[in-house]
Amino acid sequence: MSVTAAKGFTAAGITAGIKESGSPDLALVVNTGPRRSAAGVFTSNRVKAAPVLWSEQVLKSGEVTAVVLNSGGANACTGPKGFQDTHATAEKAADVLGTGAGEVAVCSTGLIGVLLPMDKLLPGVEAAAGQLSEHGGEKAAIAIKTTDTVHKTSVVTRDGWTVGGMAKGAGMLAPGLATMLVVITTDADLETEALDRALRAATRVTFDRVDSDGCMSTNDTVLLLSSGSSGVTPEYDAFAEAVRTVCDDLGQQLIRDAEGASKDIKVEVVNAATEDEAVQVGRTIARNNLLKCAIHGEDPNWGRVLSAIGTTDAAFEPDRLNVAINGVWVCKNGGVGEDRELVDMRYREVHIVADLAAGDATATIWTNDLTADYVHENSAYSS
């Protein structure tokens, strides 16, 4: 049920004609209240798409009534006209829903540098409003796909309240956030401050640590909306855990659907001096193309892990480094460890542990292997 699993939300997903393929390309999510609290986090890319600039302003009020999402065009690097088009999209949604444009967030995904076909998008907003349903969450999730092969949803239900979400993303997966559009809804009765705190805490250890290809999008948006319709105000820790669970689930789905990937790689850094250094080392390992190629070839090449670690400024002694691949400590104290022939890499999941022996901090980064399919898909993608 995705974003409509929580009470107080309706959604729709339609084909507006934005995509030449004729696939669904426009989604609408509406908070019917009584509360309309909202929080959001956005790309840290300095080149921000028009809908990101618009939605950042909308979120300053802490209230969102509706979210319009389109696939088939990013509306990024489109100048003043692109921002005007985003404003017009919000105005159209506000008009048909009877609210203000300042309470309508807008999200776009697709090709950068191309204006959206507003003659199709604006009528599409009206058509989507006419199809809003408490059961429309799945259709909305399908409508925001680009190179995704599957739509991505997650739901967690606790004692009298629910958190549900949908996400898109398959390429340009790297922090801040990953290339993603995410809408998370809850019927827990919470104010904006609690939503913002929980969302930022969750994204820091989930979406911000998904790093498939090291490329950062211009359009990343994660929104958390509360309708308050359950009438239940949960303890903050319980709510934050539920939000983190949904974000983690959606983040794992992003990795499993990454463009061209044949291996999902969990890079776990342990015994680092600080968490920041653990993240730095994990990200450096995850972005090492030589290692990603080795994993694709089912080669437990621990030397490439050590080489990657050595390019960081994290605290460690080279002769104390240990590396395990799928449970086999192939590197011990900076040299040869257990027999690499013991490493079973036939399956999709690959787990790398890098032990820095420098402290007690840990961090995990998720990535993929590098394949010919990834190169083909991104060389064939129009630019």
Curated annotation (Swiss-Prot):
GO terms for cellular component: cytoplasm. The record marks A178, T179 as: Cleavage. It is an enzyme of class 2 (transferase). NCBIfam families: ArgJ, PRK05388.1. Pfam families: ArgJ. Keywords: Acyltransferase, Amino-acid biosynthesis, Arginine biosynthesis, Autocatalytic cleavage, Cytoplasm, Multifunctional enzyme, Transferase. Heterotetramer of two alpha and two beta chains. Its EC number is 2.3.1.35, 2.3.1.1. One of its GO terms (molecular function) is L-glutamate N-acetyltransferase activity. The record marks T109, G110 as: Involved in the stabilization of negative charge on the oxyanion by the formation of the oxyanion hole. It is found in: Cytoplasm. It catalyses: N(2)-acetyl-L-ornithine + L-glutamate = N-acetyl-L-glutamate + L-ornithine; L-glutamate + acetyl-CoA = N-acetyl-L-glutamate + CoA + H(+). The keyword Hydrolase does not apply. Pathway: Amino-acid biosynthesis; L-arginine biosynthesis; L-ornithine and N-acetyl-L-glutamate from L-glutamate and N(2)-acetyl-L-ornithine (cyclic): step 1/1; Amino-acid biosynthesis; L-arginine biosynthesis; N(2)-acetyl-L-ornithine from L-glutamate: step 1/4. The active site is at T179 (nucleophile). It comes from the Bacteria. This is Arginine biosynthesis bifunctional protein ArgJ.
